[in-house]
């Protein structure tokens, strides 16, 4: 019985910690500039990418990993959404903290047409403890939504929501 009580306490502490970290995360990552200050990114040629260069565009940053099956599951829908939203000024950036060769191999194997980036640092740098996690930024670079978990990006509801931003 003592083990079960300890387990319940540990689970409760984890839940309270997660609630606190989400609140902190939302305050710290309010715009693309604050995200750029927290971390740096490189493309698959190891060239530094400045996120502030995307100001003027709506940006979806999706944090994922090659080992994350929910992340991979949502990618076909994301490809369709990217095509549907091409006239709505959206840029999709898929960010992983894995090494460039692993990301490149995944991109080449799957033949996905995304802007794949490597974050220099871990997902914890962003306050991300669950994958996939996506941030949606408006044209001014202000974060308008954080989505934790799998998204059906090509659903009518999501497409309409993204068109409305």
Labelled PLM ranges:
Residues 2-10:
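Sec-dependent signal peptide recognition
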Residues 20-51:
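N-terminal "domain-start" segment that seeds a small globular fold
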Residues 57-59, 63-67, 130:
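Short pre-active-site segment immediately N-terminal to redox-active cysteine/selenocysteine motifs
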Residues 63-80:
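Conserved redox-active cysteine motifs that mediate thiol-disulfide chemistry
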Residues 86-92:
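A conserved nucleotide-sugar
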Residues 93, 104-140:
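Short, internal strand/loop/helix patches
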């Amino acid at each position: 019985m003592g083990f079960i009580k300890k387990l319940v306490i540990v689970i409760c502490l984890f839940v309270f910690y997660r609630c606190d970290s989400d609140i902190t995360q939302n305050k710290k990552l309010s715009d693309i500039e604050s995200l750029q200050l927290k971390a740096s990114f490189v493309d698959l040629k190891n060239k530094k990418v400045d996120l502030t260069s995307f100001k003027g565009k709506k940006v979806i940053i999706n944090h994922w990993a090659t080992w994350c099956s929910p992340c991979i599951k949502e990618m076909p829908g994301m490809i369709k959404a990217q095509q549907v939203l091409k006239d709505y000024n959206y840029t999709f950036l898929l960010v992983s903290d894995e090494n460039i060769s692993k990301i490149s191999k995944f991109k080449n194997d799957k033949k996905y047409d995304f802007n794949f980036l490597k974050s220099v640092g871990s997902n914890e740098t962003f306050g991300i403890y669950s994958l996939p996690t996506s941030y949606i930024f408006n044209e001014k670079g202000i974060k308008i939504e954080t989505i934790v978990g799998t998204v059906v990006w090509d659903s009518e509801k999501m497409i309409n929501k993204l068109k409305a931003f």
